[in-house]
Amino acid sequence: MFDAAPIKKVSVVIPVYNEQESLPELIRRTTTACESLGKAWEILLIDDGSSDSSAELMVKASQEADSHIISILLNRNYGQHAAIMAGFSHVSGDLIITLDADLQNPPEEIPRLVAKADEGFDVVGTVRQNRQDSLFRKSASKIINLLIQRTTGKAMGDYGCMLRAYRRPIIDTMLRCHERSTFIPILANIFARRATEIPVHHAEREFGDSKYSFMRLINLMYDLVTCLTTTPLRLLSLLGSVIAIGGFSLSVLLIVLRLALGPQWAAEGVFMLFAVLFTFIGAQFIGMGLLGEYIGRIYNDVRARPRYFVQQVIYPESTPFTEESHQ
């Protein structure tokens, strides 16, 4: 039995994208929650290429007296999970907590995650209670959660909630992974020895709109399927086998009917033959597209380009410095 190391410092990683309205309240509430921990702490804000004044507000917060805020500025938008990975590469805590900037997951839940992690868990996930999202978002989330559970075999209730806690060894291991498409909650669970979930409150979004549109949710679902499991390829092989057997059986049936009923019947069955042909062609194109997606991801991973470009990091009471990039 392995004993978990004591938690001496907590790092809170928050990706920010056009959240200027919620940032002041986010910083205030997160700071208050961290001060109640009785441990050392830091807050890392990662600007994911915001077009509003989010970056300026972050820099100002880092430069205040007695600030515990580190601001990381990416040169453009790379996506939520890439921004979080950028934050992971700068943390110094023993326990790292991720939190969205929209305040739908209350920062006041942070002490509960820390207390649960203190029980020896490597990963502490959360399940949103009484979700305040639209029916579309709730339905899409249920489909994605079910899809993840079926394809990865990792049974957790709410993969879409980013309010989560990870011990430092899990973070260090994830940073050594170089996949271009990364879904952090699943990747962490792959390496976790002990994982659990706790229920948390969920509030309505007070400022701005959700950054996940319908198309982004569709792309997220497709990314999850193709970057985390080879199950679709296995299903494709199974589907191909079924179609091949069905096609062979249908061919035998058509030959028998042709011999039994004569050429008159064969002429009248032309449209059915076309329908069967188009079905097979459609299945082939679907298979080719899926294989192409996997090959494209392999190509991107082989090139090993950095996930993001860190333009600037602002530490409390320090001078900003520039980094070239980070994988």
From Swiss-Prot:
Catalytic reaction list: UDP-4-deoxy-4-formamido-beta-L-arabinose + di-trans,octa-cis-undecaprenyl phosphate = 4-deoxy-4-formamido-alpha-L-arabinopyranosyl di-trans,octa-cis-undecaprenyl phosphate + UDP
Localization per record: Cell inner membrane
Top-level lineage group: Bacteria
InterPro entries (UniProt xref): ArnC_tfrase, Glyco_trans_2-like, Glycosyltransferase_2, Nucleotide-diphossugar_trans
GO biological process terms held by the UniProt record: 4-amino-4-deoxy-alpha-L-arabinopyranosyl undecaprenyl phosphate biosynthetic process; lipid A biosynthetic process; lipopolysaccharide biosynthetic process; response to antibiotic
Enzyme class of the recorded protein, top EC level: transferase
Keywords of the record: Antibiotic resistance, Cell inner membrane, Cell membrane, Glycosyltransferase, Lipid A biosynthesis, Lipid biosynthesis, Lipid metabolism, Lipopolysaccharide biosynthesis, Membrane, Transferase, Transmembrane, Transmembrane helix
Alphabetized GO MF terms: phosphotransferase activity, for other substituted phosphate groups; undecaprenyl-phosphate 4-deoxy-4-formamido-L-arabinose transferase activity
Induction: Induced by BasR.
Physiological role: Catalyzes the transfer of 4-deoxy-4-formamido-L-arabinose from UDP to undecaprenyl phosphate. The modified arabinose is attached to lipid A and is required for resistance to polymyxin and cationic antimicrobial peptides. Plays an important role in pathogenesis by providing resistance to antimicrobial peptides within macrophages or at other anatomic sites encountered during infection.
Name used for this protein in its record: Undecaprenyl-phosphate 4-deoxy-4-formamido-L-arabinose transferase
Species: Salmonella typhimurium (strain LT2 / SGSC1412 / ATCC 700720)
Gene: arnC
